[in-house]
A protein has these predicted regions:
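Conserved hydrophobic positions within beta-strands
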Residues: 1, 38, 89, 113-117
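A structural micro-motif recognizing beta-strand termini
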Residues: 5-10, 23-24, 41-42, 67-80, ...
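A generic structural motif
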Residues: 1, 25, 98, 108-110
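Short coil-to-beta-strand transition motifs
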Residues: 29-34, 103-110
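N-terminal accessory targeting/assembly segments
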Residues: 1-50, 55-58
């Protein structure tokens, strides 16, 4: 028995249909540009979808969550020879006037920097750092990461809230 969670129209789907797994858990892309967008529940950028298909989402429309062609001003914060572990900040990007996006090494990656890009303009898919991992392999790190939505981001310490975040917005979900 298999349970399927769907996010689109299911007309034509019936028991016994062949299912092809993607091999990946439902994931989001984390990187520069995430704060300048409005997404639906599965990280589809609604403004880009509206540009391509109008007010209604066309069947089969595929849009990248984050703009893969936009070049961001990137300040690289690491240099060759540094030992990095998961969560280390490798680059900073001014995403909005008040928010600096910090790109990090994925949590499960540790290694030595063997190459680092110079400060400049890069897309979220351009390599920013190349690490030599403990097993001798090399891994390129970009400004963006895919992250499974059901896996919490690891933290060293959780700080309790001392002051409530008051936004002035009232949200009802019934």
């Amino acid at each position: 028995t298999t349970t399927v969670q769907v996010f689109e129209e299911t007309t034509g789907l019936k028991p016994g249909e062949t299912v092809t797994a993607s091999g990946d858990a439902l994931s989001v892309t984390l990187g520069p540009g995430i704060l300048n967008n409005i997404f639906d529940g599965i990280e589809r950028p609604l403004s880009e979808i509206a540009k391509q298909s109008g007010k209604y989402i066309s069947r089969g429309l595929t849009v990248d969550s984050l703009d893969t062609e936009k070049k961001w001003d990137v300040h690289v914060t690491v240099s060759e020879g540094e030992e990095l572990m998961g969560g280390a900040i490798i680059a900073e990007t001014q995403e909005t006037r008040s928010i600096v996006h910090k790109s990090m090494v994925p949590p499960d990656v540790n290694g030595t920097v063997i190459w680092a890009a110079k400060d400049g303009k890069y897309t979220i898919l351009d390599p920013i750092v190349k690490l030599k991992l403990e097993d001798g392999t090399e891994k390129e790190i970009t400004l963006a990461q895919k992250w499974p939505i059901r896996v919490p981001r690891p933290t060293l310490k959780r700080y309790p809230a001392s002051v409530p975040l008051i936004t002035g917005q009232r949200i009802l979900d019934t």
